[in-house]
Amino acid sequence: FILGFLTVANFIALIAGAQVAQAAADKPLNVLVLYADDWRHDTLGAAGNTIVKTPRLDALADQGMRFTQNCVTTSICGVSRACLYTGQWMSRNGCEGFNMFTTPWEQTYPGKLRENGYHVGHIGKWHNGKFPKQNYDFGRSYQGKHWFEGKDGKKIHVTQRNENDALEFLKTRPADKPFCLTLAFFATHAEDRHPDQFLPQPQSMKLYQDVTIPVAANATEESWQRLPSFFDEKNEGRNRWHWRFDTPEKYQTMMKNYYRLATEVDSTCGKVLDELKKQGVLDNTLVIFTTDNGYYHAEHGLADKWYPHQESIRVPLIIRDPRMPEKKHGSTNNDFTLSV
């Protein structure tokens, strides 16, 4: 099992074609895409990060394959998402920002799978124009804030809302159809208009209290000064660096809350996988974890993403394929892979 230069979206789309050729007695593979936000390649224990706690995603890597050199083609939220859904570069899919891509829906992986009899759902962040709810059997899109007002009038965290909706999808899906669910988290994206930026759930605040998160060797004024002249103090990446990282105290506060959000996403991924196991379908489900782009943690004197440094374009990719030989479980693939 080697993905090599086969890209993620086209890999998913191939599942649809393969199901048509399967014998009637075989069960088509379900597809679960766990799609995080602003999460770079090394925000995983499995990737060697000794501070962030991601036990459920680490376990997923132990049961599948982790791709160490996976990159997005464009490190911009909406564009990167369009590339994943369509399997096409920005120059072909027509999305140059946050608009709806021009590629026909039937050519996207949700479209292909639904056309082939799948029960298809999307939960969480969309970010490509108006959410096309009519194209999904189960569609709930929301983003932009860490806290929402719930049905009972109480506040609910966006990651908890993601979890509730994902479990509802799995518990209410028709048992006689395969499913494809894209669970698109808003965390670990910052709430840009909020002074605290990263707002985890109260129970997570005890995490990372007693650690000091190291600052990268290239998170220096010298690294900033080496950038081309069009990187000035008006640059949005530099502006957001001031929001988040321009003092040692601010860096520690922001990074700890960022990691808390990551651990919450990890927990929700685990709850969803537990439900699949409870239903007896985990070993008939292709599970993919990846993200829309990386993230500067003050490297080069920047924050956020957008530019072609590894911190910005290199993202995690874990694939758990039940057809994978057991000897491949827990392996890594160092081939160059892309999100288109």
Describe these PLM feature segments.
Residues Q22-M65, T74, G97, R114:
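Active-site-proximal N-terminal segment of extracellular/periplasmic enzymes that hydrolyze or transfer
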Residues D26-L29, D38-I51, K145-H157, K171-K177, ...:
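Active-site-proximal cap/lid insertion segments
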Residues C83-P174, A187, E191-Q201:
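Catalytic-site neighborhoods of secreted/periplasmic enzymes
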Residues M65, Y118, V281:
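Short phosphate-binding/catalytic loops that engage adenosine nucleotides
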Residues I2-G17:
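Bacterial N-terminal signal peptides
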Residues A46-I51, M65-Q88, N99-T102, H122-P132, ...:
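Short, solvent-exposed turn/loop segments enriched in Gly/Ser/Thr/Pro and often Arg
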Residues N30, I51-D62, R66, S80-C83, ...:
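Extracytoplasmic/secreted proteins, especially bacterial periplasmic and envelope-associated proteins
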